[in-house]
Amino acid sequence: YTPGSTAGLPISVLGSFAAPPASLRDDADTCRQLVQGAVSGLLTLLGVDADPLSSREHILLSAVLDQRWQQGQDLDLAGLIQAVQEPGMSRIGVMELESFYPAKARFELAMRINNLLAAPGFAAWMEGEPLDAGRLLYTAKGQPRVSVLSIAHLDDAGRMFFVTLLLNAVIAWMR
C-alpha cells in the first residue's frame, strides 16, 4: 500500500476521522489519545506546529472531534471544515468561543484545511481502500495476511500524518 500515492495500492485516509466504537468512546483515556493523535497528525500535515496544551488550533479541533465522537458522529475533512466554522459549542473550557477563537480566525483555519482538501496532491490520500487495521491484517474470510505499507515517498509531515492515523486505527482495532 502507498498512502498519498497511486504508485502502489492507494489507501484512503478520509474515513480516519470516523467515530470509534462505543466501547472505545467509553474509555476516556483511549478516546483522548485517539483524538489527540488524529488532531496532531492533521495539524502536522497542515504545517502547524501545535502543542496540544497551548495551541488554540489543537484545542479547538480536539474539542470538536471529541464532541462529535462522543455523539457517535463520523467526520470527514469536509465535515471537519464545517465544524471548525460552526463548532456547536459556546465555550472552550471556561472561555466563550468567540473570545477563545473568534469566527474570523476559525474561518482561516477552515480555509487551511479546505486548501489541503482541494490540493491536487491530496487527491491520492482519498483514493483506495479505507484505512482499517482489521482489513490490513485479515482477509474477508478471516485468514491472516501481510500488508506492506510504504511511506518512503512521503515527506516528514505526510509520514507523521499517516503513521498517526495508522496507529489510531491499530489501537481502535486492538481494543
Where are these regions (language model features)?
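P-loop NTPase motor domains
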Residues: Y1-R175
